């Protein structure tokens, strides 16, 4: 089962977005949190490489806590 890793400042909204984009969405988890986007971006690819996940790079910088999330899925929609 493939897995995906990403970063966001709004985990609830991001989770809902991914639920609509993939089939078999499961095992949503917050892997870590950081004070800056740069710290989260540094952690994200290391985790992805270590566990064989696809990294999904976040969008524009935003204030607040940055969360690194992960989940499993069966396939993308479409």
Sequence positions of predicted segments:
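Boundary/linker segments flanking structured domains
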Residues: 1-2, 9-78
